[in-house]
Amino acid sequence: MILRALLILLLLASCGRPLTEAEVEFLTDLNGGTIDTNRVRLVDGTPATAITFRRPARPRVTCRELILPPIEEKIVTGKPGAVALFNKVYVRKDLYLDDYMQGHPDDVSLLAVMFFAHEMIHVWQWQNRKQTGYHPLKAASEHGQGEDPYLFEIEDQTEFLDFGYEQQASIVEEYVCCRALDRDAPRTQRLHDMIAQSFPVARLDQNILGRAVRLPWDEVEVKGICGKA
């Protein structure tokens, strides 16, 4: 099934839009120029097959979970939000945007920027595969091991590249959330220091998101959201 999807994606290789100026600026700050943004394309739609699976209730201890309403464990059917293949990201139609930094520098959707950052890390993993050992099929194999590939725990001595590919993307997604809402928190600093082991992320005192972010849920308790290291 994976090989079939891979072939379909290759047939669509000529499709996709380039990154916007604001997206490039954000990525340059986030990744320190370690992504060749000219090669990146975002495609509206993914040929991935819908699957039925048990969606677990994730622990509400991270910024990326706390900005959303609680989710109950249940059986769901759906397609993945995106499929990253080399320098292309195929985005599910309901999540595709013409600009994930829309509104910058006045205000941006935090959820959109987090989603964009997550997927761009997969592009970074591919473009820097001599460092990461990445291949799309390796990343896909993480989804068939019975555990949630996106969950991670930060240990004192853990290196960024010690994590799985989806975990690395989730760590950067969490970092964007914490940097936006709780920049001075211990967790934000720990995430920053760990990510900086692998690429030159912008200093925490630099504003890479603009003047404000829009939250996806009215009941978010922002104060201390990343206070736990």
Language-model segments: residues:
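Metalloprotease/metallohydrolase-associated module, dominated by Zn2+-dependent proteases
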Residues: A22-T28, I35, A84-F86, K93, ...
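Conserved beta-strand->loop/alpha-helix structural units within folded catalytic cores of enzymes
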Residues: A112-W126, A180
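Sec-dependent signal peptide recognition
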Residues: M1-L9
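Catalytic Zn2+-binding segment of zinc metalloproteases
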Residues: M120-K138
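Catalytic zinc-binding patch centered on the HExxH motif and its immediate surroundings
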Residues: P47-R92, Y96
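Short pre-active-site segment immediately N-terminal to the catalytic Zn-binding motif
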Residues: K74-A82, K93-A117, E159-L161
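Post-signal peptide N-terminal segment of mature Sec-exported envelope proteins
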Residues: A22-I51
